Amino acid sequence: MDRISAQKDIFKKVVNKENSSIFVSLGVFAVSVAILKSRLGNFLVPQL
């Protein structure tokens, strides 16, 4: 729970400092990277 609350505080600081559009684009980029990592992991782990 502490980690989630810390992330929310960071998100609030980012939103306050940057435009919401930039924050949304960064969020979408992070999600896409996470999906790519999960897919690559699924492909590479069985091969190893």
Swiss-Prot record:
Domain of life of the source: Eukaryota
GO cellular component term, pick one: mitochondrion
Major localisation: membrane
Membrane topology value: Single-pass membrane protein
GO biological process, one term: vacuole-mitochondria membrane tethering
Alphabetical UniProt keywords: Membrane, Transmembrane, Transmembrane helix
Transmembrane segments: 21-43
Cellular localization per UniProt: Membrane
Protein name in the entry: Uncharacterized protein SPAC823.17
Originating species: Schizosaccharomyces pombe (strain 972 / ATCC 24843)
